């Protein structure tokens, strides 16, 4: 069989000088393909397949139930993915904590990145050593439900069902919820399970009461810390006493030995001072520390003893009440110093530090000397004590130019067979507007005590007043006697304002009303 090729007629060559033909109208030439070439390509393809089959034999895979679509289980994969995600979240949270710690540093104001955490507090069980049960408080029955907030437009609803922000029920529930903002110590009651509604009037009254109670508690707390109480001292006073012991002036403070309306007295053992040799003053072996109370409860009604005293009159109006108490301690120091120079038995002043006065201790081995009210004396000792008291009153009036103003059996001690005078912080000079009245009151207290004690020689208050002051006031009854005393005080006060004299000795040589001496 002859192989016959199939071919298309070829066009002849075109003349160069002939007219040009359009390329779109020119048919494409068909490439002829012989039968021999086709047979050779199929043979080559078969040979290639045989070689591939020989080189790569076919692997037969047996069919099993594990590849069926009905039994596919991916729960373990989901759990692994969740565990991996949780680990990634914890690493992210740890990185946030490091960044937060680095960002805050040692600053007192810190910024928290807790809102950017990925792990929930309930799931983050490894973040704390102690296992704490986390409880979602969103549905806590013990937490009152928050009122529905009012939108910006100011009302809710439409038509007849409009509810404004001024609605009585809405305002009542809001006021009930606002009670949680009161101070922790303010009792607001338990309203669980009750739909409480407080009116604006009641809520405003409660709010004002809560604020006033908070301010009052703060004042009481401050007053307790900054004021002395009975048998106790405030921190500032305690610090002053500690400095006295630390400096070596006092060896030790044993405890409280007496309490009064204005002061508390402590016992202490004396030490030594660095400038003790220079001053020539030795600290007693036993000392009494008189701490004036800073509560101001008793001093408010006792300012008349100091504001009219010319020694402190100019300073009294310029001081606040707390500094006035320090002036009381200073006044007692000056009075004791004046009495000590006159030889009157009284405590010796060692040191004055603000409102703390250190004096010599009248007693022995931490046992204070008894008061005349407490001691039991025989008739001879009581008589001796009376004449000693009379002499001390005359000596205090004439030599010290002072009136005790609170002399009684409670402010006189019996020690070593002598009468000792104490508590002279309120003592004034006779030129005081009420000095003679204070002297008459002292005479009454002394006369009544010794008359009750069995001293028949004791003078009455009018006779004792004339004996001490040297004035010859003759009056049959107490009312007339007091009237003459007030008249004398008025004359003396007018004389002081007219002449400007500050001397305190009365002229007693003539019978005229007492005036101030020129010297």
Swiss-Prot record:
Domain Protein kinase as annotated: residue spans: 251-519
Sequence intervals crossing the membrane: none
Keyword Acetylation on entry: no
Higher taxonomy: Eukaryota, Metazoa, Chordata, Craniata, Vertebrata
GO molecular function: ATP binding; caspase binding; metal ion binding; protein serine kinase activity; protein serine/threonine kinase activity
One CC-aspect GO term: cytoplasm
Cellular localization per UniProt: Cytoplasm
Enzyme Commission numbers on file: 2.7.11.1
Positions of the catalytic residues: 406 (proton acceptor)
CDD domains: RIO3_euk
InterPro entries, sorted: Kinase-like_dom_sf, RIO-type_Ser/Thr_kinase, RIO_dom, RIO_kinase, RIO_kinase_CS, Ser/Thr_kinase_Rio3
Region (Disordered): 122-159
Acidic residues: compositionally biased ranges: 124-134
Leading EC class: transferase
Signal peptide: none
The protein's name in its UniProt record: Serine/threonine-protein kinase RIO3
Reactions performed catalytically: L-seryl-[protein] + ATP = O-phospho-L-seryl-[protein] + ADP + H(+); L-threonyl-[protein] + ATP = O-phospho-L-threonyl-[protein] + ADP + H(+)
């Amino acid at each position: 069989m002859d192989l016959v090729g199939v071919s298309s007629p070829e066009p002849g060559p075109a003349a160069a000088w002939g007219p040009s033909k359009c390329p779109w109208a020119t048919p494409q030439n068909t490439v002829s393909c012989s039968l021999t070439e086709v047979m050779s390509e199929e043979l080559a393809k078969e040979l290639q397949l045989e070689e591939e089959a020989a080189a790569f034999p076919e692997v037969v895979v047996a069919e099993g139930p594990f590849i069926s679509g009905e039994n596919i289980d991916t729960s373990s994969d989901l759990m692994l993915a969740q565990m991996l995600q949780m680990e990634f979240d914890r690493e992210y949270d740890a990185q946030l904590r490091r960044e937060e710690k680095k960002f805050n540093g040692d600053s007192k104001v810190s910024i928290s990145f807790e809102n950017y955490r990925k792990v929930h507090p309930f799931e983050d069980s490894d973040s704390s050593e102690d296992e704490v049960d986390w409880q979602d408080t969103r549905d806590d029955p013990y937490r009152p439900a928050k009122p529905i907030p009012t939108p910006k437009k100011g009302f809710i609803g439409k038509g007849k069902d409009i509810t404004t922000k001024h609605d009585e029920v809405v305002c009542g529930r809001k006021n009930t919820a606002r009670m949680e903002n009161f101070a922790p110590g303010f009792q607001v009651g338990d309203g669980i399970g009750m739909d409480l509604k407080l009116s604006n009037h009641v809520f405003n009254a409660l709010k004002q009461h809560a604020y006033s109670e908070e301010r009052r508690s703060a004042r009481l707390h401050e007053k307790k810390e900054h004021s002395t109480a009975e048998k106790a001292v405030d921190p500032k006073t305690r610090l002053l006493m500690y400095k006295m012991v630390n400096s070596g002036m006092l060896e030790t403070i044993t405890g409280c030995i007496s309490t009064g309306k204005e002061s508390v007295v402590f016992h202490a053992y004396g030490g030594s001072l660095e400038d003790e040799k220079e001053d020539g003053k030795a600290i007693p072996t036993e000392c009494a520390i008189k701490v004036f109370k800073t509560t101001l409860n008793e001093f408010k009604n006792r300012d008349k003893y100091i504001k009219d005293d010319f020694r402190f009159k100019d300073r009294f109006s310029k001081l606040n009440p707390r500094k006035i108490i320090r002036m009381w301690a200073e006044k007692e120091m000056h009075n004791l110093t004046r009495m000590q120079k006159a030889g009157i038995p009284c405590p010796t002043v060692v040191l004055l530090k603000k409102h703390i006065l250190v004096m010599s201790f009248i007693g022995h081995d931490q046992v204070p000397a008894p008061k005349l009210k407490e001691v039991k004396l025989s008739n001879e000792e009581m008589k001796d004590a009376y004449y000693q008291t009379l002499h001390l009153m005359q000596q205090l009036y004439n030599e010290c130019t002072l009136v005790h103003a609170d002399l009684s059996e409670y402010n006189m001690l019996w020690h070593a067979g002598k009468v000792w005078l104490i508590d002279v912080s309120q003592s004034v000079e006779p030129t005081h507007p009420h000095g003679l009245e204070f002297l008459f009151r002292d005479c009454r207290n002394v006369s009544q005590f010794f008359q009750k004690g069995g001293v028949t020689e004791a003078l009455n208050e009018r006779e004792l007043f004339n004996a001490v002051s040297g004035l010859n006031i003759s009056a049959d009854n107490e009312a007339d006697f007091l009237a003459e005393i007030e008249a004398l005080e008025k004359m003396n006060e007018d004389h002081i304002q007219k002449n400007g004299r500050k001397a305190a000795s009365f002229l007693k040589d003539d019978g005229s009303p007492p005036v101030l001496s020129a010297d």
